[in-house]
Amino acid sequence: MAISHGFNKTEAATSVTAPVTVNSGLQIVVGTAPVNMLDDPEAAVNTPMLVNTFKEAAAAVGYSDDFAKYTLCEAVSASFQVMGISPIVVVNVLDPANAKHITELSDKTVQVNDGIAEIDETGILLKKLVVKKEQTVLTADEDYSARFNDDGTVSIALVNGGKGDGATALTISGSILDPTKITAADIVGGVNAATGAETGLEVVRQVFPKLGMVPGILLAPRFSKDPMVCAALQAKCRKINGVFDAVCFVDIDSSASGARKYTDVANQKVKQGATSREAYGLWLYGKIGSAIYSGSSLAAAAAVYNDSLYNDTPNASPSNVSVPISSACLEDGTEVLMDQEQGNVLNEQGVATFIRSGDFVVWGNETCCYPKNTDPKDAFLCVRRFFNHSWTSFVLDNMSKLDKPMNKKRLQSIIDSENMKGSVYVSTEG
């Protein structure tokens, strides 16, 4: 038998669980995209799609600079091109299989120049496009080829020797996937009683089971000014998958029927029903060149960018974070010159905005429950988000321990893990 004489040691495996990286600001964006530009548009409807780059986003749901029509593209641009952060999850509700989302394109004559015809309509479904030379129907890929231009319009190139060869004009007809047909009900979504299929904001439930990621910020840019959508966003932030909590960034209406001046914002906030601790309300849009971005898209991207400066931890407010816009404006592009004093008036009503402080910055720490609810864990966005983040981290770190016998060793392991995370937070605080 071996004799242990002198100094000897044994090492036991560490019982402290390594913390799981949490994408605390994972944006889940529900809206519209030009999916007609895809080879299989139906595959990009009412399903959560994780995109890590601008190129991935364009491949997943299509892309257009017309943000008023295609709100997912606005969020994609705000995140990847404006603030330079990733990833985001996009959920498109514009459905080519839904007749309510279709506008029929009647016979339209387009001129042919050097064998090329340009269709200035956007949203065209190529599979339903009918192209005729006089009364002769042309066959795709035999008599002509069709491709999308960067702006979503379509170019038709006639094939030499095909039935359209030599034509000076073509007649086109078909179906257009029309984003103006989308309603608040499409964004809110629901569950089909017969099939169980989920649509709209109900798809948020699928993010964790499908992608293994926890929603952090829910968005429905521009649509969130609607009281029905605003209410649904706030409700969906609570008990996602029965466990997780999130926040939502909502636009306070600045259209012709909304708040056109800052003194009207408090009433508009109440009118929209933006009153919960989960909601962070933004009044005003931001303009970059000729492009107009909703406040919710810009502020959400700014918040996530700010998280990245603190090791993916939402312990700092997005307030006073720079956003590279050239002006703040109403939904229609009318410039609004907000100063700190006016911005503070909105903050006192639980609404954030954009002011110029050297650069343009997000301005406001308070959630929409303020001033009625002044509890710091509810009233301040960074505190609310940190509570959500801490709980999510705890759940993910300890999920493997569920249904295991609880003993002193396992309990101490949980305590040590949480203490370790707390020590990291303290050592990296900035």
Which residue ranges define each predicted feature?
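Glycine/proline-rich low-complexity spacer/linker segments in large multi-domain proteins
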Residues: E118-I119, G123, I176-L201
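Short secondary-structure junctions
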Residues: V424-G430
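Extended C-terminal subregions enriched in glycine
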Residues: N407-I415
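A glycine- and small-residue-enriched flexible loop/hinge signal that marks low-structured segments
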Residues: A2-V45, M49-K55, G62, A68-H101, ...
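Extended beta-strand solenoid/passenger and fiber regions
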Residues: I85-D150, I176-P179
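Short, hydrophobic/aromatic-enriched beta-strand segments in well-ordered soluble domains
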Residues: T168-I176
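A surface-exposed beta-strand-loop module
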Residues: E142-A167
